[in-house]
Amino acid sequence: MQVQPTKYVGLVADLMPNIRLMQASGHFLFRYVTGPILIRKVYSWWTLAMVLIQFFAILGNLATNADDVNELTANTITTLFFTHSVTKFIYFAVNSENFYRTLAIWNQTNTHPLFAESDARYHSIALAKMRKLLVLVMATTVLSVVAWVTITFFGESVKTVLDKATNETYTVDIPRLPIKSWYPWNAMSGPAYIFSFIYQIYFLLFSMVQSNLADVMFCSWLLLACEQLQHLKGIMRSLMELSASLDTYRPNSSQLFRAISAGSKSELIINEEKDPDVKDFDLSGIYSSKADWGAQFRAPSTLQTFDENGRNGNPNGLTRKQEMMVRSAIKYWVERHKHVVRLVSAIGDTYGPALLLHMLTSTIKLTLLAYQATKIDGVNVYGLTVIGYLCYALAQVFLFCIFGNRLIEESSSVMEAAYSCHWYDGSEEAKTFVQIVCQQCQKAMTISGAKFFTVSLDLFASVLGAVVTYFMVLVQLK
């Protein structure tokens, strides 16, 4: 048995409620725990066994009721619905190291004294959105389970059977359970029925929670990346004003070095009459390549100066410390943007295959649901069930498409923000910096499903359009 430390930082601390729920639902998430890991492993394997047993029972029902087309279609939809949960559960277990690696990417973020308040503000915005998303998705999941169980008690509990001798269909009674399943015991009544009913409620809740929690973690990663891009765009104008103080006269230039936005009027760097000793101003905390990127060689923390003989010659009378802080601001922006790019790349590598499996399953399921929707003849149990399946399946696709689309929008607008700021008033360093930013940010950041498609609202629109088109064709052929 092993006990992990209880102090967490960065993205792990932000997603701790999500992580705790994933551990409670049985995910193979053995880090970030405070108790014996052996118990966690036994619990996860037990949960996997319980989920697989019920899933095989659903497959057994599909195999034993393949004669009637309507029954086969309905059972196939149910099987595909829970395939999401099983695949994501197993995928997380097999690919857990990549999840750990992605969570650890944001544990070594550095900030800059001039932009600390902006960084903290956008971090708090991202954190609030993560929590709201988690609450909303979990509430929807619980309500879906309640609705699924409730609708079980309405309508007839029968299935259609084909008589091969006469080629006619007839109905037979089946256990009134939330999910049609094949069991080796008689679940029509008695203790076997009660056990089967409770077991299926457990399966419903855990399987849907497991799948949705993994999606919420993916969307939370994208939320953080989007808010960090907002942070970088927000400080672009201030960065230009700071850089302008290096070679252009600016009245009250000392105001640039006050933390007014943080509620303090104290100077971040004191204007000293004499040329200060710069040894006590260490910039190594602002994204040192060795600590943050694992590079073999560490870049020097002392930034270059263009003053002759190392003397302060700028028109605003800035001290060496202030000059170094201004130049380090550009370094901070570039390295933070690289950090976001690295995070987005890790997100795609970690969750891309799961998105591909999700879309493949959803495409087949939505096609079958469009066929089932043509048979709705009123407000009844059948109609509500089909509409419920359809809305839930589309909501799952829309969830990660909307956040993937926002990432594209935020990353593509970085170049516009760089061009729109007063770059022409900045120093030569700043002008070169803006030019490089515009070149590097021409291509938007995207999340792909294992390189097969890009996660965006265009993907959702194409899926929805295909379903509607197929539905209209079936209606005309009916």
From Swiss-Prot:
PANTHER family: ODORANT RECEPTOR, ODORANT RECEPTOR CORECEPTOR. The lineage of its organism: Eukaryota, Metazoa, Ecdysozoa, Arthropoda, Hexapoda. It is found in: Cell membrane. GO terms for biological process: detection of chemical stimulus involved in sensory perception of smell; sensory perception of smell; sensory perception of taste; signal transduction. Belongs to the insect chemoreceptor superfamily. Heteromeric odorant receptor channel (TC 1.A.69) family. Orco subfamily. Glycans are attached at N167. Expressed in olfactory and gustatory organs of both adult and immature stages. Highest expression is seen in adult antennae and the maxillary palps. Lower expression also seen in proboscis and legs. Within the antenna, expression originates in cell bodies and projects into the lumen of an individual sensillum, presumably along the dendritic extension of the neuron. Within the maxillary palps, expression is seen in a small number of cell bodies and in projections into the sensillar cone. Residues 63-73, 155-188, 362-382, 476-478 are extracellular. This is Odorant receptor coreceptor. It comes from the Eukaryota. It comes from Anopheles gambiae. Coiled coil: none annotated. The gene is Orco. One of its GO terms (molecular function) is taste receptor activity.
